[in-house]
UniProtKB/Swiss-Prot annotation:
GO cellular component: cytoplasm
Localization annotation: Cytoplasm
GO terms (BP aspect): amino acid biosynthetic process; aromatic amino acid family biosynthetic process; chorismate biosynthetic process
Assigned keywords, A-Z: Amino-acid biosynthesis, Aromatic amino acid biosynthesis, Cytoplasm, Transferase
Enzyme class at the top of the EC tree: transferase
Organism: Shewanella sp. (strain W3-18-1)
Protein name as it appears in the record: 3-phosphoshikimate 1-carboxyvinyltransferase
Residue stretches in coiled coil: none
């Protein structure tokens, strides 16, 4: 197994241009596919999850042209649904942002489509989405365990109507349903059961749909109305914002060991909820400066916070490791959906924080972290989870440094993360 040793870092400073958002990249690729016209996507993320989506689209007959560095994609839309005369089997790795939306989109047309993935994908729930699609007339069959991939879709189109979907597990279920609803045979009313997690991710979806000419009526996140007869029209160009979750590591670095760290590609005009991570750092005592398309973090003594972070679940992981450098006990609440991500992130985070000496209380949907008097060095397991590797890079700011196991797992969203992280040192 590959390991990366991060020696102690005294101070960080510099500027990082954040690579494109995974969430926006895969949503935009699917909408461009369903749209009429050719769309040029710029600042597209070049990572494993996006490659799985692109490979699947190519297999489904979608034509696109990628720039040499894979960050510009010119895609010819189908002007409607995806159909195939022959049976197709698509491998989607561990890319939830490809599996859930494609599962929904492939019910719209005609054909037989089988969706598979890595072993962890077979543990990531999709049942709530499939139940909703079945209610609208879709024929979806599980190949192993009910409620989980792999699955086969025998597509004949999607009816309109009223449908319920759970909101308390993953916003990706609702996102997938929203994106396909305009191409159903009738109007669709989506009723959300339970508290909707990660509302800002739904805002991203609705904003992108609007860019492609489709209107969603949002009744206070409890009901969403999509009127029949709409179609996606290419806006010609889509700029993919920098990934706000990825920005969190560099902003935390600035807060802990700044110096001054500036991230560009996200800012106050961002449509991503995870930019609110900077507000949490500010509550902890960091000096934060906002621009339209940049955020600056400067170092200052940090104190613990006790906050509901349901609205920023991915970026909240960075707070868990930043808490080791804050005075007092930090509590991160309402984060049950950490458990159904690339790994069970609540259990993984608790295990690895204890390795470095932290006192940790792991609840069903919260984590409570008290830093040790002296942080210990350790070998951090990353569970094939990109965010675990990036979060624990913060331990380079301890006097003892840290070792990261399987550092290349960052290829899911940020292949050259550790190179960029090193550029801030000195």
């Amino acid at each position: 197994m590959k390991q990366l040793r991060l020696e102690p870092v005294v101070q960080v400073r510099g500027e990082i241009n954040i690579p494109g958002s995974k969430s926006i990249s895969n949503r935009a690729l699917l909408l461009a596919t369903l749209a009429q016209g050719t769309t040029t996507l710029t600042n597209l993320l070049d990572s494993d999850d996006i490659r799985h989506m692109l490979a699947s689209l190519k297999q489904l007959g979608v034509n696109y042209r990628l720039s040499q560095n894979n960050t510009v994609c010119e895609l010819d839309g189908l002007g409607g649904v995806i159909s195939s005369a022959s049976a197709q089997e698509l491998f989607l790795g561990n890319a939830g942002t490809a599996m859930r939306p494609l599962c929904a989109a492939l019910t719209l047309g005609q054909g037989e489509f089988t969706l598979t993935g890595e072993p962890r994908m077979e543990e990531r729930p999709i049942g709530d989405l499939v139940d909703a699609l079945r209610k609208l007339g879709a024929n979806v069959v599980y190949l192993k365990n009910d409620g989980f991939p792999p699955l086969t879709i025998n597509a004949t189109g999607l009816n309109g109507g009223d449908v319920e979907i759970a909101g308390d597990l993953s916003s990706q279920f609702l996102t997938a349903l929203l994106m396909v609803a305009p191409l159903a045979k009738g109007s669709v009313n989506i009723h959300v059961k339970g508290e909707l997690v990660s509302k800002p991710y739904i805002d991203i979806t609705i904003a992108l749909m609007a860019q492609f000419g489709v209107n969603v009526i949002n009744h206070d996140y409890a009901r969403f109305e999509i009127v029949a007869g709409q179609r996606y029209i290419s806006p010609c160009k889509v700029l993919v914002e920098g990934d706000a979750s990825s920005a969190s590591y560099f902003l935390a670095a600035g807060a802990i060991k700044g110096g001054e760290v500036k991230v560009t590609g996200v800012g106050r005009l961002s449509i991503q909820g995870d930019v609110k991570f900077a507000d949490v750092l500010e509550k902890m005592g960091a000096d934060i400066e906002w621009g339209d398309d940049y955020i600056i973090a400067r170092g200052s003594p940090l104190t613990a916070v006790d906050l509901d972070m349901n609205h920023i679940p991915d970026a909240a992981m960075t707070i868990a490791t930043a808490a080791l450098f804050a005075k007092g006990t930090t509590v991160i609440r309402n984060i049950y959906n950490w458990r159904i991500k690339e790994t069970d992130r609540l259990a993984a985070m608790a295990t690895e924080l204890r390795k470095v000496g932290a006192e940790v209380e792991e609840g069903n949907d919260y984590i409570k972290i008290t830093p040790p008097a002296v942080i210990n060095t350790a070998e951090i397991d990353t569970y094939n989870d990109h965010r675990m590797a990036m979060c624990f890079s913060m331990l380079a700011f301890a006097d003892c440094g840290i070792t990261i196991n399987d550092p290349d797992c960052t290829s899911k969203t940020f292949p050259d993360y550790f190179k960029q992280f090193a550029s801030l040192q000195g």
